[in-house]
Regions:
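Short beta-strand micro-motifs enriched in acidic
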Residues: 6-10, 20, 96-100
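Bulky hydrophobic/aromatic packing residues
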Residues: 107, 117, 129, 153-154
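ATP-dependent carboxylate/phosphate-activation module, predominantly the ATP-grasp catalytic core
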Residues: 9-77, 86, 114-142
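Contiguous mid-protein beta-loop-alpha structural module that forms a pocket-lining wall or clamp
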Residues: 10, 80, 108
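Extended catalytic-interface subdomain
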Residues: 1-5
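Peripheral (often C-terminal) accessory segments that flank ATP-dependent C-N-forming ligase machineries
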Residues: 132-194
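Conserved metal-phosphate-binding beta-hairpin within the catalytic cores
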Residues: 83-117
């Protein structure tokens, strides 16, 4: 597997909580967004409605419903096993779809298992709390990207809602947390920044 194949293909994660009685509850699924260097820049909640449609930042690639179902089955098995072994609390199971040598999409249904709160879990909660569209995204957006567009990104703007301050200890930050609730804005970000 070449990491190059993985850069433009989605990685996704399931946010699951395991209980004390080995039963796990699916909190949600997200598509992770990364820049050209592979650095995490945000997450988009996805569900069955996303299957069969192109995923953001992945032109020509659609997540097949069979792949999505396999991901959910395998993640459920991992989280149920963790509960049986005594773990209870947040757990994230990441999967990866990558291109094989012939360009066909291949699935690695268990990429990582994280027994902690993850950026995807945080993103999922921000999108639930402030998203109004059917496809909000939470991003660690560069301040320059916002300022170059003259966007009014504030804690009260329903389409571009800041979830972190622009300054910390009287110093400007380079990136801010942002719930982006306009698909055109998200497409703009993906085409110019990622």
């Amino acid at each position: 597997l070449s990491s190059h194949w993985c850069l433009s293909i989605p990685k996704s994660g399931r946010r699951i909580e395991t209980g004390r009685l080995a039963e796990s509850e699916l909190i949600g699924t997200t598509q992770l967004l990364v820049d050209q260097s592979g650095q995490y820049v945000g997450s988009i909640p996805i569900d069955y409605a996303a299957t069969g449609k192109p995923l953001f930042g992945c032109p020509g690639f659609c997540l097949a419903s069979e792949m999505f179902e396999q991901i959910l089955r395998d993640a459920r098995q991992v989280t149920d096993d963790a509960g049986i072994l005594g773990y209870h609390g947040p757990i994230s199971v990441d999967s990866m779809v990558y291109r094989g040598p012939d360009g066909e999409p291949l699935l690695r249904s268990i990429q990582d298992v994280n027994a902690r709160l993850t950026m995807g879990r945080i993103a999922l909660e921000w999108c639930r709390r402030f998203g109004t569209s059917n496809r909000p995204a939470w991003l660690l957006a560069p301040i320059k990207w916002l300022d170059d567009r003259g966007w009014d990104a504030t804690p009260d703007n329903p389409l571009r809602r800041l979830t972190s301050p622009r300054t910390v200890a009287q110093r400007d930050v380079k990136r801010v947390g942002l719930v982006l609730d306009d698909p055109a804005d998200l497409q703009d970000l993906l085409s110019t920044y990622l």
